[in-house]
């Protein structure tokens, strides 16, 4: 069954703490559409506030009104500096809390359990400050699923009040709507500036204030806006006692956002992110910011630069008397296309740099090559806040978040030198104080840390640049300032996590440790819910508290075996190497062509013919009927791995005398040059049959093609296939630069999508853009380190880039990694492909390789005339490789060994491939290469399955040639009985 995806996007505008989701379902073609088949049946928002902090819990009930099972995907951004700290999913009608699990392990367990048609729940952090979960199954005909997400946040200061703001401008009725807000330890009445309806009012009980409303069939149209007045200079300190004599503290200092004058620049660089994702920024806010800036800095030279998959210089403008109309018009007409590659950034020499971007480099790694003050400016809901802060901190600039701040106010960061937190005076009784690096004071300031002991006095320093101009004194008292039922430690952990994630790769282990202890979702840790307690035992995952007793009892009594992992593939690889060597030594000679026999022959001739027939060593008949090709899928031959080849000396006496297959053995010292056979590869372009291709039918030059593409892109902007097909047209018309721009835009379509990045890697390999092929492959490996194909793709990309040692190391990892039983079964036989590729590297680049760690039992000289490998970008997909030789014999899954020695690897029916065809010595004539799409079990944002075929002649001989074919499946449903012709050999 093809899985249909839902996507729920929670968009958070200014001061937003949550937002009602927009619900969409897959259109079956890689995009999404609005639908009333799945609705938000219930929305419950519960917020608890104490001091300047809040804990927010959002509960959603999704109802499936369709007649089919649905799989939901919820993707939502959270405000700057905030991470999800709680996740729960209903199991058998009851919410079960998630537990922290390493991100890669959570994915692996998810993939493994999914093979049993039981889906766990996983909440993970993807690129930027975005969080994603999947809900499956949602039963048909009114089935419901409940999920709950919790996060902690700090109230924002606006003027002399702290503000809690919740937008509730939903466009459709919600069958059940509940909102409840509780304010603790407040002596003053919270002020309702705006409320959803007349019933929502605060009621006081002691020093606790509560307001709530419960509606049915309700369409909320008014927002919730609560103000909390504050006195200037006041302090609010909350503490939570911990083990030993330690306490966590959170001190909120009510600061004035002071500033002092600075010399305004004479020249500025406006660096404008014009990648495809750039169109999603709020350009109106960006223009308001610039308008306010030029009102103050009225005479300045502005040089424009653009970053997408390339770095481009724009025009230069002279701003006079604050008139920036020309610049505004110029920026308003920018078109957005291509991926985002911060690795392309060039050195800029202007006094200051204004960098307008979301901070997500989707097509290359960040390289810092300038030291001029850089002001990173974000107006997008989806942004990599840590990347943006890193750039601004590194260059002594500032980060401006237009999405959560008024551009007219935050412009002062560009015009003045702001007051900054500069640290604390050394105090041995406090540790792990955050922030630990200088931080600009916007409206207020929060300091967190750990106190050892009962009390201390802490001196906090503020100033400009490196100059301390003000010191605040705060008193910490664990007895007097302790609060019950508030996780102050979670706020501390969040602050620490924010700093660690600025350098997430270097701090990977510490991020995991912190997330594991405090249940935070991070770039390295996810939150996971499993269906039954046995799975927690099996996969060695500590369960939530409600299952701990049952979990411990099972472990104690050893009633459930822990997951049986396959330690590595080395033993199978050794067996397969011997198998390949035996096959390689076996000599195949095709049956000579038989001519009509005369009817009048002598008796002796007949006898002689009969004598010969008695000793024929028969192979597979060359006259195969079409019935072979029509065998049912269920008829499987024994895996080549399980066959035994016997090289006998006896048949050698028949050499040259027997009709049929002649068998011999090859000398171990036979040179690779003896295998070289001059041949020709012809690849066939698989043309797209998409309806939009008619738009380009008369376009015969790159400029026209690109213009048509931009003109019609809005209609197809979420279809990767559209970019893929147009890029192919541009490559075909010899415009590699434009083709790469269109192709790279695929990277901006979704967050952490391995299917899209595999598609990119395939096409980049074909286009010989090897550095970007490596980047895409490494991203997939980062997201899916449990797939052997991830290491293989990275290895082959390293080889394309000339890094043969890294290629060898990553291929070898495929054989030395451990795998779950389910994934090992899925990829059974992959070692055959890996062995050929390891030995090809050794054969062609031995002098450049360190082989000390390579098992000699898998090393063998195995040159061949023909090698073909196909793989594809989707899991749970079955693509077949067919090769038809000059004798018209087809080698495929039901005929894995041919008369002339063709050999096909194991048939991969549930994973990403690969499948491989080998032929040691090519028979003279033409060979036909086809692929057959047998089936896929899901269609997501990536669209139809992408297939890559690597076609070699004289492989591992030192004279090998390669051609690449990449295409997307053209058949939307079912099997293509005729196959797709992708190439031919001729020898």
Question: Where would I find each of the regions flagged by the language model?
Answer:
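An acidic, Ser/Thr-enriched
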Residues: 86-91, 97-125, 134-139, 146-271, ...
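Intrinsic-disorder/low-complexity signal
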Residues: 841-987
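Short, small/polar-rich motifs associated with maturation and membrane association
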Residues: 592-678
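Von Willebrand factor
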Residues: 261-356, 360-362, 383-384
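Generic helix N-cap/helix-start motif at coil->alpha-helix transitions
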Residues: 369-371, 684-688, 716-723, 736, ...
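N-terminal, polar/Ser/Thr-rich
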Residues: 18-51, 116
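VWA/integrin I-like adhesion module and closely mimicked acidic/polar interface patches used
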Residues: 357-402, 406-413
């Amino acid at each position: 069954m093809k899985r249909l995806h839902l996507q729920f996007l929670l968009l958070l505008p200014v001061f937003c703490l949550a937002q009602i989701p927009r619900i969409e379902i897959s259109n079956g073609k890689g995009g999404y559409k609005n639908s009333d088949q799945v609705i938000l049946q219930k929305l419950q928002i519960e917020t608890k506030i104490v001091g300047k902090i809040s804990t927010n819990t959002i509960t959603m009930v999704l109802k499936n009104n369709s007649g089919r099972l649905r799989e939901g995907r919820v993707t939502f951004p959270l405000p700057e500096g905030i991470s999800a700290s709680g996740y729960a999913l209903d199991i058998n009608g009851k919410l079960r809390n998630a537990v922290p699990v390493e991100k890669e392990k959570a994915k692996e367990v998810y993939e493994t359990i999914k093979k049993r048609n039981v889906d766990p729940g996983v909440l993970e952090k993807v690129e930027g400050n975005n969080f994603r979960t999947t809900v499956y199954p949602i039963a048909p005909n009114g089935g419901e699923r409940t999920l709950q997400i919790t996060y902690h946040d700090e109230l924002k200061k606006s003027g002399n009040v702290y503000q809690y703001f919740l937008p509730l401008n939903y466009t459709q009725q919600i069958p059940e709507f509940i909102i409840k807000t509780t304010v603790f330890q407040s002596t003053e009445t919270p002020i309702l500036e705006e409320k959803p309806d007349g019933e929502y009012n605060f009621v006081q009980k002691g020093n606790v204030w509560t307001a709530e409303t419960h509606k049915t069939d309700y369409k909320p149209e008014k927002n919730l806006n609560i103000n909390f007045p504050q006195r200037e200079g006041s302090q609010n300190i909350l503490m939570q006692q911990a083990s030993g004599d330690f306490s966590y503290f959170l001190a909120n200092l009510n600061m004035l956002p002071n500033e002092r004058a600075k010399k305004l620049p004479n020249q500025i660089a406006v660096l404008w992110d014009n990648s495809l994702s750039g169109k999603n920024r709020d350009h109106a806010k960006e223009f308001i910011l610039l308008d306010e800036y030029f009102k103050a800095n009225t005479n300045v030279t502005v040089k424009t630069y653009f970053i997408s998959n390339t770095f481009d210089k724009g025009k230069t403008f002279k701003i006079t008397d604050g008139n920036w109309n020309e610049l505004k018009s110029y920026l308003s007409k920018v078109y957005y296309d291509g991926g985002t590659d911060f690795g392309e950034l060039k050195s800029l020499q202007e006094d200051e740099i204004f960098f307008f971007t979301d901070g997500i480099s989707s097509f290359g790694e960040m390289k810092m090559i300038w030291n001029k003050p850089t002001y990173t400016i974000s107006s997008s809901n989806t942004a990599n806040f840590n990347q943006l802060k890193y750039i601004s901190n590194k260059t002594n600039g500032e980060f401006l978040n237009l999405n959560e701040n008024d551009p007219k106010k935050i412009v002062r960061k560009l015009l003045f030198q702001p007051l900054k937190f500069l640290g604390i005076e050394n105090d041995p009784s406090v540790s792990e104080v955050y922030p630990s690096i200088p931080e600009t004071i916007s409206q207020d300031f929060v300091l967190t840390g750990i106190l050892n002991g009962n009390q201390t006095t802490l001196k906090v320093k503020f100033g400009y640049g490196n100059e301390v101009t003000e010191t605040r004194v705060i008193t910490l008292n664990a007895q007097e300032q302790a609060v019950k039922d508030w996780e102050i430690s979670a706020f501390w952990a969040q602050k620490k996590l924010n700093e660690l994630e600025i350098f997430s790769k270097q701090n990977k282990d510490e991020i995991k440790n912190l997330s594991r202890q405090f249940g935070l979702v991070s770039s390295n840790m996810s939150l996971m819910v499993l269906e039954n307690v046995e799975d927690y035992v099996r996969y060695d995952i500590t369960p939530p508290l409600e299952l701990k007793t049952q979990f411990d009892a099972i472990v104690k009594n050893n009633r459930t075996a822990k997951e049986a992992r396959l330690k590595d593939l080395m033993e199978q690889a050794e067996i397969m190497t011997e198998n390949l060597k035996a096959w390689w030594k076996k000599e195949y000679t095709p049956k000579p062509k038989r001519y009509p026999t005369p009817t009048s022959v002598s008796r002796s001739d007949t006898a002689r013919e009969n004598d010969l027939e008695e000793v024929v060593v028969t192979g597979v008949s060359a006259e195969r009927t079409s019935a072979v090709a029509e065998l049912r899928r269920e008829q499987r031959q024994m895996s080549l791995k399980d066959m035994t080849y016997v090289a006998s000396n006896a048949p050698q006496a028949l050499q040259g005398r027997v009709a049929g297959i002649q068998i011999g053995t090859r000398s171990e010292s036979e040179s690779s040059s003896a295998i070289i056979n001059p041949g020709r590869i012809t690849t066939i372009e698989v043309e797209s049959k998409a309806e939009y291709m008619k738009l380009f039918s008369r376009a015969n030059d790159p400029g026209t093609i690109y213009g048509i593409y931009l003109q019609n892109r809005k209609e197809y902007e979420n279809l990767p296939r559209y970019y893929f097909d147009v890029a192919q047209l541009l490559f075909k018309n010899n415009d590699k630069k434009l083709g790469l721009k269109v192709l790279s835009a695929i990277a901006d379509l979704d967050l952490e999508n391995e299917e899209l990045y595999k598609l990119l890697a395939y096409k980049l390999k074909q286009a010989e853009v090897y550095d970007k092929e490596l980047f895409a492959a490494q991203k997939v490996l980062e997201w899916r380190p449990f797939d052997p194909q991830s290491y293989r793709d990275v290895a082959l990309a390293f080889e394309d880039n000339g890094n043969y040692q890294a290629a060898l190391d990553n291929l070898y990892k495929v054989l030395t990694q451990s795998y779950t039983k389910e994934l090992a079964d899925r990829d059974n036989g992959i070692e055959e492909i890996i062995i050929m590729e390891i030995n090809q590297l050794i054969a062609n680049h031995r002098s450049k390789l360190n082989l000390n760690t390579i098992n000699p039992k898998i090393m063998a000289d195995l040159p061949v005339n023909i090698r073909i490998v196909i793989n594809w970008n989707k899991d749970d997909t079955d693509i077949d490789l067919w090769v038809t030789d000059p004798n018209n014999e087809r080698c495929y899954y039901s005929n894995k060994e041919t008369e002339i020695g063709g050999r096909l690897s194991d048939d991969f029916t549930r994973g990403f491939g690969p499948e491989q065809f080998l032929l040691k010595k090519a028979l003279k004539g033409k060979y036909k290469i086809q692929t057959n799409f047998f089936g896929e079990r899901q269609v997501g944002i990536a669209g139809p399955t992408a297939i890559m075929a690597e076609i070699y002649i004289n492989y591992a001989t030192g004279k090998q040639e390669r051609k690449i074919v990449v295409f997307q499946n053209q058949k939307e449903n079912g099997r293509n009985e005729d196959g797709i012709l992708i190439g031919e050999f001729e020898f």
